Every structure is written in structure tokens, then in C-alpha cells.
A protein has these predicted regions:
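Juxtamembrane transmembrane-helix termini in multi-pass membrane transport proteins
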Residues: 2-75, 139-157
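Alpha-helical membrane-protein architecture signal
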Residues: 5, 9, 13, 113-125
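Hydrophobic/aromatic residues within the transmembrane alpha-helices of Major Facilitator Superfamily
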Residues: 16, 20, 53-54, 90, ...
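Hydrophobic alpha-helical transmembrane segments in multi-pass integral membrane proteins
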Residues: 58-60, 129, 134-138, 200-213
Length: 213
């Protein structure tokens, strides 16, 4: 039992460090928070957490090893992810325009608010179409988790990481949708949208150029 807690602690630390690092998931939650508000951002965060479950499932079922050993599968997935991030980047750049900065700006909808399903799907696709995330778990589990650890325990690890991811990005959503914080950001929203659009395009280019190591 003690070894399980050791594994759990190591997995948690490595995963939280990875989740807290700026990346496409963080950029997407920031975009959703500023453009659409808390509800949309939190549902996007839940979609990202669900994406983690997909990557963990790949690792537990051995599909991740197939991806790791198949340049063709890796290439197909990375280009799908790159095209999605590029599309998001272009949409973000197109939405960049000056907006009013008065107190009413927080309540004003600057764009049609996505449905719950659309917000969740956005988060899920942002995470699920990133093959680097799958390779992260494929590399992490064999190093940290003993092969003798029961599959049920490993599933528990995966569920925890999905919940922790959703909780982290939900917290980010709450922080960036505080009225004072959101007002401050919205004063410069057209510049932030432009910057985020460029960031998404940069992530798309980086993913498209990624190689198996």
C-alpha cells in the first residue's frame, strides 16, 4: 500500500508540473474566460480533463505504445491537432477588435456564447488532439508505476489526474473571470486576442514540426 502512495505522489507531482506549464490548454481556457465568461471556461476545463482520460486510456491499453512506435499514426494525429489549433488561432485573430472598457463590459456578450456541449468539445479536442500529451503519459507510467500495480489502481491514478486537470483549469477560469480581473483584461482585449491568436498558431506550428524521439 505504501508503494502505491509513493507512485501516486510521484505521478501527481509530475502531472501537476506539466499541467501548470503554459500550453494550448491554458491558452484555450484563457481565451474562453475572456471571450465568453466563467460558465464556458469551466465547461472547457471539464473537456480538457476528459481529454486526459483519453490519453491515460491509451497508455493503459497499450495504444500509446502503438502511437509511439508508428510514425504514420503520430503524423496523422499531430497534423489533425495542428490544423485544429491553427483554426482556433485564425478565429481568435479574426475576433480581435477594440471593445468598450466600461463597467458594463463584463455583462456584455462580445460574441455568441457557446453551448455547454460546444464549450466541452472545444476543451476536449484541444487536449485530445495533442499526441505529445499521449507520449507524456506513455513515458511517465512505465517510469513511475510498477508493472505489478493492479490495473484498478492505475485506473484510479488516471481518474485522479483527469479530475486534477479539470480542477486546475476551473480554478484558472474562476481567477480570470473575476469582474475586476476580466475588466482589466478586456481593456486590452483586442491586443490579447491578437497575442493569443499568434500563440495558437505558434503551438500549431510546433506540433506540426514535432518528431518522435
Amino acid at each position: 500500500m505504501q508503494s502505491y502512495w509513493t507512485e501516486f505522489g510521484a505521478l501527481t507531482l509530475a502531472h501537476l508540473l506539466a499541467v501548470a506549464s503554459p500550453g494550448p490548454d491554458f491558452a484555450m481556457v484563457l481565451r474562453q474566460s475572456l471571450a465568453h465568461g466563467r460558465r464556458t471556461a469551466i465547461w472547457t476545463s471539464l473537456g480538457i480533463g476528459t481529454g486526459i482520460l483519453l490519453h491515460v486510456s491509451y497508455s493503459l491499453l497499450g495504444i500509446g505504445l502503438v502511437l509511439q512506435g508508428s510514425p504514420t499514426a503520430f503524423t496523422v494525429l499531430k497534423y489533425a491537432g495542428a490544423m485544429y489549433l491553427a483554426w482556433v488561432g485564425v478565429q481568435t485573430l479574426r475576433s480581435a477588435r477594440p471593445r468598450a472598457a466600461g463597467p458594463e463590459v463584463v455583462a456584455e456578450k462580445t460574441a455568441p456564447e457557446p453551448s455547454t456541449r460546444a464549450a466541452w468539445t472545444t476543451g476536449f479536442l484541444t487536449n485530445a488532439l495533442n499526441p505529445k500529451a499521449t507520449l507524456f503519459f506513455v513515458a511517465l507510467f512505465p517510469v513511475v508505476v510498477n508493472p505489478a500495480t493492479p490495473r484498478s489502481v492505475q485506473v484510479g491514478y488516471g481518474l485522479w489526474m483527469a479530475l486534477a486537470t479539470a480542477a486546475w483549469f476551473s480554478l484558472v477560469s474562476v481567477v480570470f473571470t473575476q469582474p475586476a480581473t476580466r475588466r482589466a483584461f478586456l481593456r486590452w482585449s483586442h491586443w490579447i486576442d491578437r497575442a493569443l491568436g499568434v500563440v495558437f498558431l505558434g503551438f500549431a506550428a510546433g506540433l506540426a514540426l514535432a518528431t518522435l524521439r
